[in-house]
Regions:
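Vicinal oxygen chelate
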Residues: 2-9, 23, 32-37, 57, ...
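Generic structural signal for well-ordered beta-strand positions
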Residues: 51, 160-161, 266, 360-361
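A broadly used, surface-exposed interaction patch
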Residues: 88-90, 97, 105-111
Length: 410
């Protein structure tokens, strides 16, 4: 890790304030009490595909430790080719196995995971965090998923993961066979490592059947014409994020995400006397939003979670309108108590609740920040009328801009 000048790090030939650069939100997860309903909600209603599961119960010291606590499996889910972009674990089992989880039951988010640009960046981050006294939960390589990573805590004990190189699920829909989990690492790896391609080549030489991994079968028939493709629901998730958090101290949380993880402040809002902060990792208006805990009750949201909302971007405005009807028809609870002032950079959005009461923010458009680093002036933003959903919209200058979805929708 070479440095040049005052506290600058050479990241691929560019001098940065951190020895890594976050490119995007890679995945995110909840700890749920209502596991059966949660799996159905996220897979059948929202369209996440289960790419793998693992048995959390294997960590128990005795069968009695987790007896009667429900589904032992953790579910790894995807909307595209990344092995997982969303993860569900059983909250009661995690608390039974982990004293820290028992001590902080309001931390129902199990991970906030950010993609960096290379394995070297992960390795340099691990070293730098250690030098700065940033508490590291663990480092290594996960299986399932194959992502090289390190986990650190923010000022509210949310677990943030930095990773590189997550497994890709290809055209046949099969995840990596479990026999290939021998490349799991439980500590920071020595660099360089062999490539993913060479791992597959070795598996073929060893006679591994590459199609023996998990393959998801959708529980609903593909009856909706979604812009020319038949899908089981009338919309398609094409991106995850932003992550919106309730925090004890907005200033302290902002300092961690800015100074330690390298996020950039895009905008701040004062709402009913409370400061709210919107930060970005790339060109999107915000990939992270920070709100004071005092707003939970004012917004009618769960008082026992630090998750304000988890964002899901749909492919277009028409699909967002279709999603509102589809989810309402299938019994999803919707709230209109989250005012537009608290999600600048997004125009039309709907907020729905999962079976545990976590708020999900569905939207289709995210304002993009250009070369000068300035967001769109407030007076030039679209101003939706509450409760009105026009049949069609005039475009903004950055409509359909930002991170694209790669590959087929289904």
């Amino acid at each position: 890790m070479e440095t040049s000048g005052q506290m600058k790090f050479n990241v691929g030939g560019v001098l940065l304030d951190q020895p890594f650069k976050i490119r995007r939100l890679g995945h995110f997860g909840f700890n749920l009490v209502n596991m059966e309903e949660g799996v159905r909600f996220y897979s059948e209603l929202l369209g996440f595909k289960v790419s793998d599961n693992n048995d959390m119960g294997r960590r128990a010291t005795s069968p009695e430790q987790i007896a009667g606590l429900g589904d032992r499996k953790g579910y790894f889910m995807r909307y595209g080719t990344d092995h997982h972009s969303f993860v569900i674990f059983n909250k009661r089992i995690r608390e039974a196995l982990n004293p820290e989880a028992r001590a902080r039951p309001e931390l129902t988010i199990n991970q906030i995971t950010w993609q960096v640009g290379s394995l070297r960046e992960v390795g340099n981050a691990i070293k730098w965090f250690g030098e700065r006294g940033v508490k590291i939960q663990r480092s290594g390589r996960d299986m399932p998923g194959s992502n090289w990573h390190t986990y650190v805590y923010d000022s509210d004990r949310h677990i943030n993961e930095l990773y590189y190189g997550i497994e890709q699920v290809g055209w046949n829909g099969h995840s990596k066979p479990k026999v290939m989990y021998n490349r799991r690492f439980d500590e920071a790896p020595e660099l360089p490592q062999i490539s993913e391609f060479d791992e597959v080549q070795q598996a073929l030489k060893d006679g591994v059947e590459l199609t023996s991994g998990h393959r998801h079968i959708d529980g609903l028939p593909a009856t909706y014409d979604v812009d020319g493709i038949l899908l089981p629901r009338p919309f398609k998730i094409v991106r995850i994020g932003p992550v919106s958090l309730f925090v004890k101290d907005v200033d302290a949380a902002e300092a961690f995400y800015r100074d330690t993880l390298g996020f950039i402040l895009t905008e701040e809002v004062s709402w009913q006397g409370h400061r709210c902060v919107f930060m970005r990792a790339n060109t999107e208006h915000h990939s992270l939003a920070l709100y004071p805990l005092a707003l939970r009750e004012k917004l009618g949201l769960r008082l026992d979670t630090t998750c304000m909302a988890f964002g899901l971007q749909l492919a277009n405005y028409q699909q967002l309108r279709n999603a509102v009807r589809f989810l309402s028809d299938h019994g999803a609870r919707v709230t209109d108590r989250v005012p537009a002032e608290l999600y600048p950079g997004i125009d039309y959005a709907v907020h729905v609740f999962d079976p545990d009461g976590h708020c999900l923010q569905l939207y289709y458009y995210m304002e993009q920040v250009g070369w000068d680093g300035k967001p769109r002036p407030k007076e030039l933003r679209r101003k939706p009328v509450h409760g009105e959903w026009p049949a069609a919209l005039e475009p903004m200058s950055d409509t359909y801009h930002g991170e694209p979805f790669l590959g087929p929708w289904g």
